[in-house]
Swiss-Prot record:
Keyword terms, alphabetized: Isomerase
GO molecular function terms listed in the Swiss-Prot or TrEMBL record: ribose-5-phosphate isomerase activity
Pathway: Carbohydrate degradation; pentose phosphate pathway; D-ribose 5-phosphate from D-ribulose 5-phosphate (non-oxidative stage): step 1/1
Keyword Coiled coil annotated: no
Catalytic activity, as annotated: aldehydo-D-ribose 5-phosphate = D-ribulose 5-phosphate
Protein name from the UniProt record: Ribose-5-phosphate isomerase A
The UniProt record lists the keyword RNA-binding: no
Residues annotated for substrate binding in this entry: T28, G29, S30, T31, D83, G84, A85, D86, K96, G97, G98, G99, K123
Active site: E105
């Protein structure tokens, strides 16, 4: 079974949690795209749900698949958000943002009663940090922001190289990647993040940092698909505790 099939299996398992009348957060990325496609099939069969997309790419996918959409300005909460992750640790802390939608993804996850993370089992790691940590920044004053980030790294016991993300493919290939919100992303190769909550707090306090890819205490459960089947891991403490 290839990686794409595993991702679709995880998406199908998460779809079992969806009930008629739910308001859903729709994640971004290759695994979340499988969920949107499968959800569209259920909608075509009569399921009544409404979704909030976390990116323009997901909005286009959901529209193509016939999933009704709304915004967080029009509804007061979401029942479930289903999204992928770049890394998941045993505490269900995440690194997200490989697709560049981390800001909207975090807003939507925080507005949800539950966040279900779907992934193939290669995303399960003992410690976060092998995957580069995305940090969304305002382009103005980037040098000062980078220096403040490096100071935060040192205070939190990590170090590594940062690079401004470049777009890949299409007519923007090689140019600076720009998020849906008009920001840039610094990808930090840290190797091992010894204390994700402390680093998350330090990064959030830096002027010029819009958001970062550490999702701490947001995931309620993770659905991991591998060669031996599906594993569902619940967070030890309920969201909000």
């Amino acid at each position: 079974m290839n990686m794409d099939q595993l991702k679709r299996q995880a998406a199908a398992r998460a779809l079992e949690e969806v009930r008629d009348g739910m308001q859903l957060g729709l994640g971004t990325g290759s695994t979340a795209k499988h969920f949107v496609e499968l959800l569209g099939e259920r909608v075509a069969a009569g399921l009544k749900v409404i979704g909030v997309p976390t990116s323009e790419a997901t909005r286009l996918d959901a529209t193509r698949c016939g999933v009704p959409l709304t915004t967080l300005d029009e509804i007061d909460h979401l029942d479930i958000t289903v999204d992928g992750a770049d890394e998941i640790d045993p505490e269900l802390n995440l690194i997200k943002g490989g697709g560049g939608a981390l800001l909207r993804e975090k807003i939507v996850a925080a507005a949800s009663d539950r966040m279900i993370v779907i992934a193939d089992d290669t995303k399960w790691v003992p410690t976060l940090g092998r995957f580069p940590l995305p940090i969304e920044v305002i382009p103005f004053g980037l040098g000062a922001t980078r220096r403040a980030i490096e100071t935060a790294f040192a205070q939190c016991g990590v170090s590594g190289q940062m690079a401004v993300r470049k777009a890949k493919g299409g007519d923007k290939d090689g140019h600076v990647f720009v998020t849906d919100g008009g920001h840039w992303i610094l990808d930090a190769q840290l190797g091992r993040i010894v204390d994700p909550p402390s680093l998350a707090k330090a990064l959030s306090a830096i002027p010029g940092v819009v958001e970062h890819g550490l999702f701490i205490g947001l995931a309620s459960s993770a659905v991991l698909a591998g060669g031996e089947g599906i594993r569902v891991i619940e967070r030890r403490k309920p969201k909000g505790d």
